[in-house]
Amino acid sequence: MKFLVILVLLGAAVAFEDDDKIVGGFTCAKNAVPYQVSLNAGYHFCGGSLINSQWVVSAAHCYKSRIQVRLGEHNIALNEGTEQFIDSQKVIKHPNYNSRNLDNDIMLIKLSTTARLSANIQSVPLPSACASAGTNCLISGWGNTLSSGTNYPDLLQCLNAPILTDSQCSNSYPGEITKNMFCAGFLAGGKDSCQGDSGGPVVCNGQLQGVVSWGYGCAQRNYPGVYTKVCNFVTWIQSTISSN
């Protein structure tokens, strides 16, 4: 889910979303993204990433006090026999999360019971270092697949996209990019995360480098997706887990 802010300007409604979904991607192979989770409140509302058997990383803008975490999902409309549904025990937003500019848009969810890891449910490692521009990453989610209009898929969608340079990112969003954000995708448009993908993973070289956070529309030219820079939060993640 990308964060959606509606700006009404001269009678035109412009979507500035922080709710991400995949546009221009492809259906992931079944259970090929075993760390991907669906956050559910009677409906899918955000994605997340399993980082160990009892903790999930998502976006702070996805916060709800009670969340059911659905693991091992591929088709979220069917029970395929690989799923585990586990309620949250704790939901912890970053203490410096800013809902206005989406700085520090990261959140931890402690599961009420430990997930049983399997071929279909696996954790993803935290980054050992920040990823450089040009690194190709896998972005995934059940978010909207249309840049204009809505189509929410049942099957998990994947997108391969490169990390953009800091200058490309800041030029696309002047004054809006903090040190805790990076851009990934294609300045030409056509491929992006979108509403419903928010909180989900950006995995580069097998490590969780990003969390789907926000963007101006989806897959629009010169407006790439913006992601939380997980490498800046490894210490916070580790200390929060150890103290909870």
Curated annotation (Swiss-Prot):
Disulfide bonds join C28-C158, C46-C62, C130-C231, C137-C204, C169-C183, C194-C218. Keywords: Calcium, Digestion, Disulfide bond, Hydrolase, Metal-binding, Protease, Secreted, Serine protease, Signal, Zymogen. Ca(2+) binds at E73, N75, E83. Its EC number is 3.4.21.4. Residues 1-15 form the signal peptide. The keyword Repressor does not apply. It is an enzyme of class 3 (hydrolase). It is found in: Secreted, Extracellular space. GO terms for cellular component: extracellular space. Its main location: secreted. Binds 1 Ca(2+) ion per subunit. The active site is at H61 (charge relay system), D105 (charge relay system), S198 (charge relay system). InterPro entries: Peptidase_S1_PA (IPR009003), Peptidase_S1_PA_chymotrypsin (IPR043504), Peptidase_S1A (IPR001314), Serine_Proteases_S1 (IPR050127), Trypsin_dom (IPR001254), TRYPSIN_HIS (IPR018114), TRYPSIN_SER (IPR033116). Belongs to the peptidase S1 family. This is Trypsin. It comes from Xenopus laevis.
